[in-house]
Amino acid sequence: GFPIPDPYCWDISFRTFYTIVDDEHKTLFNGILLLSQADNADHLNELRRCTGKHFLNEQQLMQASQYAGYAEHKKAHDDFIHKLDTWDGDVTYAKNWLVNHIKTIDFKYRGKI
């Protein structure tokens, strides 16, 4: 996988070149950082809310452009939502997932949605 930034925050190496997506990714990085600092219900619920909103927006962009990788991408989103819904406190998993999802799965749609 890709290295996990320390401190855990978005940087230009994660840029998709879609402003809305990049801004939402920054929010997800921050949400996971907050959860790593204090694993509590408020932080988890906020991360769930931001993640759900972002995934919906991203999936709508993919559908609107008839992106060929939509089904695979949506499954990755669904799997992460399930992980949040059954949260076990594994912040390292969440950090790794976001970094690797952006750099492997999201980067596939650059210039295509």
From Swiss-Prot:
Keywords: Iron, Metal-binding, Oxygen transport, Transport. Fe cation 2 binds at residues 58, 73, 77, 101, 106. GO terms for molecular function: iron ion binding; oxygen carrier activity. Fe cation 1 binds at residues 25, 54, 58, 106. The keyword Ion transport does not apply. InterPro entries: Haemerythrin, Haemerythrin_Fe_BS, Hemerythrin, Hemerythrin-like, Hemerythrin-like_sf, Hemerythrin_metal-bd. Gene3D superfamilies: Hemerythrin-like. Hemerythrin is a respiratory protein in blood cells of certain marine worms. The oxygen-binding site in each chain contains two iron atoms. Belongs to the hemerythrin family. Homooctamer. This is Hemerythrin. It comes from Themiste dyscrita (Peanut worm).
